[in-house]
Amino acid sequence: GAAPNQQAIPAVDYLMNDIGAQRWVLAGTDYVYPRTTNKILEAYLKAKGVKNEDIMISYTPFGHSDWQSIVSDIKKFGSAGKKTAVVSTVNGDANVPFYKELGNQGISAEDIPVIAFSVGEEELSGFDTAPLVGHLAAWNYFMSVDAEVNDEFIDGWLDFIDDDDRVSNDPMEAHYIGFKMWVEAVTKAGTTDSNAVQDAIIGVAVPNLSGGIATMMPNHHITKPVLIGEIQSDGQFDIVWQSSGSVPGDAWSDFLPGSKDITADWQAPLACGNYNVKTGQCSGQNYE
């Protein structure tokens, strides 16, 4: 999956620079990924000059269905005269009642746009997309990408599954890239031994489905393009923004005190996933 600098940070930049957002709702499901992402985004927004009173943070349990009071709070928060946007790390089936309640309370994508990190083609498949049309999602791949390699992949996938209604999505592309990288690394190493493949995979480059190249970095993150899509009535995405090139994944965020001095480099002699550049020590799971 994407590192925060390959999804969450560019999404905020888009909302800030292209949409003009000045007030921010960070809404997430109550578990580690949304909480960590929102800590990063809160710090990032404050570094951009956003004040505490212009940031609202909300967490709900998995499967949350009663969004009336929270959406009412979002609506009130967005009525202060500043352009407001929602950055959503809400996961799973809680998304459906969330977007429905936005519509019930008359909140359109033009009023308060929502950008999501867990709503893709598969999640939109098979249900009424009307409440979601115009809202946004940030991914590293969309089925609607205009690239010959993507068209060939989709044709092959639909032929294989024998169902023209099926969709492709970002996690599928990640598997596509990952398997091709593994094959290249095995070929390079001359063995399937996991340690040898781990060493060989750094620097491996394979085509992605957007017409570019994915490269495995020394920190075991790959380079990815960043795409922002607007939800359409057919459950597909109209790509409204994309990065000028591929973005290298940052294993440790520069916007958290506990990680800004940490780097990852799995090449010898360092071979460390959490190396503190100030202390010169490798810690955590690599501590010896």
Residue ranges and their predicted role:
Residues G1-Q105, S144-E152:
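Extracellular/periplasmic Venus flytrap/periplasmic-binding protein
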Residues A205-E288:
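Solvent-exposed, acidic/polar segments of extracytosolic/periplasmic ligand-binding ectodomains
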Residues T187-P207:
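Polar, surface-exposed loop/tail segments
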Residues I40, I177-M181:
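Short amphipathic alpha-helical face segments that pack within enzyme cores
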Residues E101-Y176, V186-T192, S243-N274, S283-G284:
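Extracellular/periplasmic periplasmic-binding protein-like sensory domains
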Residues G20-A27, S79-T84, L136-W139, D159-R166, ...:
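Flexible glycine/proline-enriched surface loops and loop-helix/loop-strand junctions
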Residues L26-T29, D164-E173, D193-V197, I213-M216:
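Surface-exposed patches in mature extracellular/periplasmic domains of secreted proteins
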Residues P10, A109, T223-V226:
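Extracytoplasmic
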